[in-house]
UniProtKB/Swiss-Prot annotation:
The keyword DNA-binding applies. This is Transcription factor TCP21. It comes from Arabidopsis thaliana (Mouse-ear cress). GO terms for cellular component: nucleus. Transcription factor involved in the regulation of the circadian clock. Acts as a repressor of CCA1 by binding to its promoter. No binding to the LHY promoter. Residues 31-85 form the TCP domain.
């Protein structure tokens, strides 16, 4: 005694319901956040279309896996200029990235001090460290003025700024100039003395060649004339 809508049992109507509704969707557990917690996460950066196209092109040319890796590479390349302009890096300390294949003396947010720079700049204070070649050529002259340098960029080149005072190269030139003039003066004096000695020897040779012959000819003529006059007197004397 039952129908599709319900059944009667001991005077009690029991309703039968069918579970034909849609199955409840299984919710996935929240995935673990694998990104670093940084300020501004979730924000979108707007850039000109030319810049975006250039980023995409660099991603293909450099063989990066994502555009974010290319932007990170660009930040690494521009980090020296960023440090020179702001004094510190622009990336938070909590930012962690995978190391790239490109070697660079700078890392995001921090500057790597090389061994050569650490040795040469150990007692120089907190200024910018210069390499051995440039440091010795500039510091060896004893110039009184200090200087600072901005790291080089391909589009701007190296920028140097010297404080008041002549550069050491000019000091070297001024110190070497009197010595050079003295050496040249000595050489000129030696050359003039040698020329005067040569002229004296030549004139003495000329005098020795001409004067003795002239005197000999004169003596010969006089002696010849005296002998002739004596013979003539002998001829006129009667015998």
């Amino acid at each position: 005694m039952a129908d599709n809508d319900g059944a009667v049992s001991n005077g009690i109507i029991v309703e039968q319901t069918s579970n034909k509704g849609p199955l409840n969707a299984v919710k996935k557990p929240p995935s673990k956040d694998r990104h670093s917690k940084v300020d501004g996460r979730g924000r979108r950066i707007r850039m000109p279309i030319i810049c975006a196209a250039r980023v995409f092109q660099l991603t293909r040319e450099l063989g990066h896996k994502s555009d974010g890796q290319t932007i990170e590479w660009l930040l690494r390349q521009a980090e020296p200029s960023i440090i020179a302009a702001t004094g510190t890096g622009t990336t938070p300390a909590s930012f962690s990235t995978a190391s790239l294949s490109t070697s660079s003396p700078f890392t995001l947010g921090k500057r790597v001090v090389r061994a050569e720079e650490g040795e040469s700049g150990g007692g120089g204070g907190g200024g910018l460290t210069v390499g051995h070649t440039m440091g010795t050529s500039l510091m060896g002259g004893g110039g009184s003025g200090g200087f600072w340098a901005v790291p080089a960029r391909p589009d701007f080149g190296q920028v140097w700024s010297f404080a008041t005072g002549a550069p050491p190269e000019m000091v070297f030139a001024q110190q070497q100039q009197p010595a050079t003039l003295f050496v040249r003066h000595q050489q000129q004096q030696q050359a003039s003395a040698a020329a005067a000695a040569a002229m004296g020897e030549a004139s003495a040779a000329r005098v020795g060649n001409y004067l003795p012959g002239h005197h000999l000819n004169l003596l010969a003529s006089l002696s010849g004339g005296a002998n002739g006059s004596g013979r003539r007197e002998d001829d006129h004397e009667p015998r």
